C-alpha cells in the first residue's frame, strides 16, 4: 500500500512539472502548475462491536443518541412517579400503600428528575450533540474524548440517583429544591443514605455537564464552517448555546452547594448546620 501511494505521488509530481503550451502544443516545463488530482474516498474507522460503538465511541451523533435514550429512561421513571402522585391526590382510598413520607419522596424525585436529569440531558445533551456539528459544519465536537466522558459521568449520576430508591429509608423527600439545612435534618424523609446519594449524583451530573458545556461553547465559537458568522448561525444552535451559557453560570454554584451539604452530612462540618 505504501509503495502504491509513493508511485502515485511521483506521478502527480511529474504531472505538475509539465504542462501543455496551448499555442504551440509542446510541453513547457517552466510553468509551475499542478493538475487537479482525484482523491479517493478516505476510509474512516468505525467500530462494529458493541463495546467500540456504544461504550468507547467518541462520535457526537452516537453520544447524542446515548444521551437521548438515558434521558428518556429517567423521564419514564419521573412519569411513573407523577402517576403515583396523582393517584394519591385523586383516589386516596386506592393508594393505601403510599404514606405521607412516600408522597414527599415522589414529589422530590419527580421534580429533580424532570428538571435536571430529563430536560437538561435531552435537549442539551441529546439534541446538542446530534445537531451542533451538523448545523455549524464541523466534523465533530472539538474535544470528542471529553464529550464521551461527559456522557458517562451523566450515566453514573443517573445510576447513583436510581440507587437511592433502594436504600433504607428510600430517596430524599425534602423537596426538589433541596433547601438546607432541612434537607439533611433528622426527621426529613430520606435523610440518611437517600439524600447522600442525591448529593453525590448532583455533583457527578454537574461535573459531566461542565465538560459537555465547554465542548459545546468552543465548538460553536471555534469550529464553524467558513463563512458562517454568528449572525448566520441557525436559531437552534443559538438556543442551545444560550442555554449552555446560562447553565454554565448556574451549575457551578449548585455543585459547590451539594459538596458543602455532603460535608455537613458526612464530616459534620458547619457550612449549613451551625450547631456543629
For each predicted feature, which ranges?
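Membrane-embedded and interfacial regions of multi-pass energy-transducing membrane proteins
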Residues: 4-6, 12-276
Amino acid at each position: 500500500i505504501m509503495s502504491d501511494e509513493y508511485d502515485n505521488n511521483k506521478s502527480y509530481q511529474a504531472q505538475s512539472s509539465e504542462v501543455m503550451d496551448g499555442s504551440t502544443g509542446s510541453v513547457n516545463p517552466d510553468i509551475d502548475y499542478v493538475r487537479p488530482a482525484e482523491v479517493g474516498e478516505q476510509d474512516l474507522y468505525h467500530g462494529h462491536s458493541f463495546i467500540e460503538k456504544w461504550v468507547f465511541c467518541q462520535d457526537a451523533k452516537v453520544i447524542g443518541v446515548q444521551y437521548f435514550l438515558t434521558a428518556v429512561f429517567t423521564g419514564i421513571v419521573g412519569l411513573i412517579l407523577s402517576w403515583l402522585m396523582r393517584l394519591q391526590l385523586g383516589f386516596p382510598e386506592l393508594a393505601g400503600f403510599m404514606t405521607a413520607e412516600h408522597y414527599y419522596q415522589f414529589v422530590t424525585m419527580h421534580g429533580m428528575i424532570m428538571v435536571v436529569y430529563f430536560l437538561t440531558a435531552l435537549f442539551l445533551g441529546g439534541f446538542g450533540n446530534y445537531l451542533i456539528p451538523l448545523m455549524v459544519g464541523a466534523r465533530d465536537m472539538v474535544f470528542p474524548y471529553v464529550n464521551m466522558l461527559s456522557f458517562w459521568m451523566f450515566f453514573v449520576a443517573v445510576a447513583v440517583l436510581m440507587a437511592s430508591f433502594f436504600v433504607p429509608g428510600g430517596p430524599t423527600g425534602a423537596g426538589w429544591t433541596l433547601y438546607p439545612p432541612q434537607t439533611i435534618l433528622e426527621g426529613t424523609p430520606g435523610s440518611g443514605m437517600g439524600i447522600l446519594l442525591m448529593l453525590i449524583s448532583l455533583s457527578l451530573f454537574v461535573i459531566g455537564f461542565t465538560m459537555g458545556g465547554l465542548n459545546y461553547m468552543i465548538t460553536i465559537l471555534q469550529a464553524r464552517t467558513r463563512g458562517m458568522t454568528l449572525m448566520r448561525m441557525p436559531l437552534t444552535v443559538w438556543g442551545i448555546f444560550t442555554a449552555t451559557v446560562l447553565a454554565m453560570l448556574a451549575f457551578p454554584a449548585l455543585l459547590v452547594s451539594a459538596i458543602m451539604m455532603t460535608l455537613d452530612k458526612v464530616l459534620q462540618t458547619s457550612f449549613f448546620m451551625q450547631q456543629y
